[in-house]
């Protein structure tokens, strides 16, 4: 067992035994899944999605969350080979001078001109349990997605 795994297990044991709450900041989504009950996904300093862990990992709503989850390695090589990875194009915008409206719009494969680059979306329920909120005008409708699904124009646009 690695040192990282031992520390994570200790944190979980302490949380269970003493009723602790953690704010756990990480980029490793497998670690986040192991340690967290609820997950917030941030992009350029703003929360773009917040949900209970299982809901977020099985039905993400924000395209950035979907792209992150598509990049998480899976232990089964057969599944890994056949899974579509959503690759975000373009450069990450400057956090000092973020884009107007939706901060993710310059890299978003679901971008709709005249809406995403003009109107900032609210962090509200976008389908699913009321505790699952996302900051997106055109949230993901199903998961897992193929790259083609991700690039498809949102319905009604």
Language-model-detected regions and their locations in the chain:
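P-loop NTP-binding/switch modules centered on Walker-like glycine-rich loops
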Residues: 3-81
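Charged, flexible cofactor/metal-binding loops and thiol motifs
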Residues: 52-157
